[in-house]
Amino acid sequence: MEIQINTLAAETFLALYSSAGWEPPCIGQIETALQNSIAAFTAYDGGRAVGMVRLIGDGGMSFYIKDFAVIPEYRSKGVGTLLLRALEAYIRGRIPADWAVSLELISTIEAVPFYKKTGFEERPCEWDGPGMFKMLRPEGKGENDGIS
């Protein structure tokens, strides 16, 4: 298994994203997201892309895990752990050793045990409230069309 950094093409992203069962955005939106990511990590097995994760954030205090996907036949085989280790090493290699930074994400229900096993805490917890999420959709295309 090989982890590559910043080689993820939009078409590969689309295939991996779709393998997770998520409705994919258009190629233009994917290209913009990849260009504006801090880094993108792709797991390859013999040249075949089998997993990915993007890192976004401010580069100093807060980092966010986005679009973490592993194709179904490679799940529970260590691919996600390898991707996460590469992502964490990347962050640690780019910040001063005495900085504490947050690494955040929104998990699917099914992935909660994986994240807990790798050191993440569910929210709410004793010291923090729940994570929040809001999808901004095109005007007139669904809920949350604006602030009331």
Regions found by a protein language model. Name each.
Residues 93-134:
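Conserved active-site alpha-helix within GNAT-family acetyltransferase domains
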